[in-house]
Every structure is written in C-alpha cells, then in structure tokens.
Amino acid sequence: MSATTDAGQLAEFNRCSTAEQYFDLLEVDYDPRVVAVNRLHILKHFAGELAKLQDAGADTENPRHLLRDYRDALVRSYEAFTNAGALDHRLFKVLKDRAPQAADFVPTSEITVQRPGSTQPSETSERTEEAR
C-alpha cells in the first residue's frame, strides 16, 4: 500500500459507522452471527482498545502503523466475544449493576446449635459457673 492509500484508508476509518464497516475496512474475518449478537459489546470493547492505544501514544504520524494497531485492537475485541459472552465482560452499566454478588461468608466457628426448648446461656451465667 502506498502512503496515499493508507491516509485514505485512515480517513475512511474515521467515517465508519457500523461494526461491519470496521471489519471490512481493516480486513478482519468475522462471523456475521457473532457480530449480530454482540455488535454493541464488540464496538464498546473496540472503543476501549482504541483509547488504550491513544493513552499509550500510538504512532499517529504513520497511517500504516496506526491502521495495523487498529486492526489488532479490532481482532482482540472480536475474539473477546468469540471466546466469552457479554455477561463475562459486563462492559455496559446495566450488566455491571446485575453482576452476581459474592455470598456472605459465615465461618463454621460462628455457627451454634440450640436445642428446642432450651435457653441460650448468657455470658454472665457462664462466668458464674467458671468462678465456682
């Protein structure tokens, strides 16, 4: 590819508005069924990957390198949802809020058994018996 083609492809990347457009432009093979089910999740993950690239100081001067980094980010985002589901990643607030909470833990040393009809001894009566 020439530099002009790379620059044009980068300009086209900035005009993409659908997941399929990103996949086609960056020449990433994909299963349309996976994209149909996970479209928003893949795009959200991809946006996060692009933000990481920007924070890491991606080579914005060289369109070819930038497009390669974008392609790698899209592949990672797509593979994240071919290997696991949306509930595993919980990218959106509605899914984060519905995340399973860890069960409260009660150690066995804290469990006491009381027979029906018997009264639970109080601390003062136990101390009294110990003093005798």
Curated annotation (Swiss-Prot):
Pfam families: NifW (PF03206). Residues 109-123 have a biased composition (Polar residues). The keyword Lipoprotein does not apply. GO terms for biological process: nitrogen fixation. Keywords: Nitrogen fixation. Homotrimer; associates with NifD. May protect the nitrogenase Fe-Mo protein from oxidative damage. This is Nitrogenase-stabilizing/protective protein NifW. It comes from Frankia alni.
